[in-house]
Amino acid sequence: MNQPCNSMEPRVMDDDMLKLAVGDQGPQEEAGQLAKQEGILFKDVLSLQLDFRNILRIDNLWQFENLRKLQLDNNIIEKIEGLENLAHLVWLDLSFNNIETIEGLDTLVNLEDLSLFNNRISKIDSLDALVKLQVLSLGNNRIDNMMNIIYLRRFKCLRTLSLSRNPISEAEDYKMFICAYLPDLMYLDYRRIDDHTKKLAEAKHQYSIDELKHQENLMQAQLEDEQAQREELEKHKTAFVEHLNGSFLFDSMYAEDSEGNNLSYLPGVGELLETYKDKFVIICVNIFEYGLKQQEKRKTELDTFSECVREAIQENQEQGKRKIAKFEEKHLSSLSAIREELELPNIEKMILECSADISELFDALMTLEMQLVEQLEETINMFERNIVDMVGLFIENVQSLMAQCRDLENHHHEKLLEISISTLEKIVEGDLDEDLPNDLRALFVDKDTIVNAVGASHDIHLLKIDNREDELVTRINSWCTRLIDRIHKDEIMRNRKRVKEINQYIDHMQSELDNLECGDILD
């Protein structure tokens, strides 16, 4: 696979090369010369041709953020890289290079046409992100395993495929295998696939295809289930009660509690622990369900607030448009009258009247804006009070429920301590009938040791409960603060933008009036 430009020295993709390429492919007449003088912004370039330049490495393309078509064929590129910012790329030609591995395409989600013809590629992979891929050219490479074809089944839009002059293209079943496993393909190696060939291929590989479809359906169902679980977890996180709809918190209390796990083997502790867990989980589920309900209330409150703000802004804008329309109708009529007037005193008087109308419009628009600012400020303050109260009530009730968890832990601790002391006394007196595991028996050397072990277990459990409560309170308070800050900042930005728009419009009207010089009018 000889490259046509290997006799030249390898070149670097620097700014000079890119500027030259952009200039060469632009208009060559007067418009092109003007564009070269003023400079062409890379971000405005939609197509870039960099073939036959002996490029060794792809680099410095990050500014071409709106590029749609990139031609890099007939170079000596060894690695696909440097394309991360080309998210809008639709067409990419990397044919006639020295590429061995498909990589670096993860951000090209809009790519439809990819050519890797005449490289050194031996495996088809790492194309998962190219969900819109329609045309794939991989001819004249080193692909020798037909299983690579199965990988391409995931590309539902793929209609054209080229794999000629690969080792697999020499296989007797090459065409039939591809037609069977890629039934939506329309062109293979630049030739249209007829319906008869498709039917023969399907019949020949029907059993294997059916088995593969079954496996794909199972995998798809699993992926959908995992996605549903992720979405559900995200919903729970939004409500700040993730992992509280079961025994997760309780289990985490014992996950790092070796003493507690050992003590669970004491006679009578198993039943005690089971009762404790059941009651504890009920409280956690209550927190979880309460959290979801409160999240819905907060969402409703936020949606209502957003709708009120939108309606207020829209109504205010409509009033402003009506005032501007009325002004412009009169203003255009006045300008026409000024141009037709021949007497200078009358012209000056009419210009003063127009200027007064402009000032009156400015006052009216600014008054509308000030009214809107006051209206939105009142709405925002009311929303802030409501959401803060809702968050405060939520925290208060959660803390109350968490206190019940601590009460259960304290009760369990007392019972466990009683059983432990009783067991110690039986061991000392030799009345213990049950055999204890060695790790557990090691705790019963004296009263201090067993009391410390029970106490350490208790401390771990309380810490887990406290940490989960603190995490919930901290996160929802942070959410509330960020939300309110964002709302205030958005309103400030909206107001500044609107005032700027009003001033620009008024300045334009006044400038237009000022340019009506008496000499021009009389002429």
UniProtKB/Swiss-Prot annotation:
LRRCT domain residues: 166-204
Keyword Repeat: yes
Entries under SMART domains matching the protein: LRR_SD22
Coiled-coil ranges from the UniProt annotation: 208-242, 366-391
Compartment(s) of residence: Cytoplasm, Cytoskeleton, Cilium axoneme; Cell projection, Cilium; Cytoplasm, Cytoskeleton, Flagellum axoneme; Cell projection, Cilium, Flagellum
GO cellular component terms, A-Z: axoneme; cilium; cytoplasm; sperm flagellum
Keywords: Cell projection, Cilium, Coiled coil, Cytoplasm, Cytoskeleton, Flagellum, Leucine-rich repeat, Repeat
InterPro entries (UniProt xref): Cilia_flagella_integrity, Leu-rich_rpt, LRR_dom_sf
Record flagged with keyword Repeat: yes
Top-rank taxon, per record: Eukaryota
Record-linked Pfam families: LRR_9
LRR-type repeats, residues: 44-65, 66-87, 88-109, 110-131, 132-153
Family membership noted in the UniProt record: Belongs to the DRC3 family.
Function statement: Component of the nexin-dynein regulatory complex (N-DRC) a key regulator of ciliary/flagellar motility which maintains the alignment and integrity of the distal axoneme and regulates microtubule sliding in motile axonemes.
Quaternary structure note: Component of the nexin-dynein regulatory complex (N-DRC). Interacts with DRC1. Interacts with TCTE1/DRC5. Interacts with DRC7.
Family matches, as PANTHER family: DYNEIN REGULATORY COMPLEX SUBUNIT 3, PROTEIN PHOSPHATASE 1 REGULATORY SUBUNIT SDS22-RELATED
Name used for this protein in its record: Dynein regulatory complex subunit 3
Species in which this protein is naturally found: Homo sapiens (Human)
Gene name of the record: DRC3
